[in-house]
Amino acid sequence: MKKLLLIAVLIAACLSATAYVACVAAPLLGKNIKGSGKIVTKTVPAPDFDGIEASRAVKVVISDKVSDIRIEADDNLIDLVVVRAVKGKLEATLDQEVNNIQNGNVTITVPANGKIRSLDASSASKIIGETTLKAGKFSIEASSAAKIKAAVEAVSCTIETSSASKVEASIEAESCSLDA
């Protein structure tokens, strides 16, 4: 009887460990994808937004030469690019199921709509402004090896950098605070 109980406990422990790996650890492993090298383009309508949040190694270009969003990426990555407006911020990233991309190219060109007042880049992403961005109050945040390059005219601005990130900016403002 004791042997049966011990076997039942061991089976339950193995099932619990398997369930843990399937539910918790497996999503952390994600997909590993290598860019194909064949760049394709997709155009989507631009939603209303006043800020840009880039993450997961995507490059965002702010241009006054486009009115829609243009996504350029390797043909095997283009369907994994996520561009959406959430609470007024334009999120540009990759699908969460992708864990690692090798030799991948993802460039998202967004319109300089005259409303942009914040730039936030993280996780090796880049934001490049091709035109001067104007706002009353402007915020720039870069973290985790991200890069932001922009020209800003504002009454006030804040710039925050951390974790090997870089901000290269031309700022014209009455006041500007920097936290690096």
Residue ranges and their predicted role:
Residues M1-A180:
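Intrinsically disordered, low-complexity terminal regions
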